[in-house]
Amino acid sequence: MGIPVEGTKGEAEAGQEELNIKYADVLSTADHHTLAKHGVKEIAHQQGYAATFLPKWNKNRVGSASHVHQSLFKKGSNVFYDAKAPMGKSKIMDHYLAGLLKY
């Protein structure tokens, strides 16, 4: 399938697994995540199991989350970082976060 998996690890609940897919351009990343989810469901089905990506399938069990790490580079440099700024956070990062919150 060509999905660049960086690693996996067990999580808090029995049968709960974390899958880390290597970063790529936006469209490739979306494709990798979609293919991975379909692949996991198909493999589970072939083994007589069901895989779910629900965030909370049982109120008495630990939930799951889906999150995406984001970065922004220009000419090989991380534009979110500014060594002189408080906490190393650049103005570009401030604007980027404001856009995420607004839209």
Q: Model-predicted segments: where are they?
A:
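Glycine-rich, acidic/polar active-site loops that bind/position phosphate-bearing ligands
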Residues: 1-103
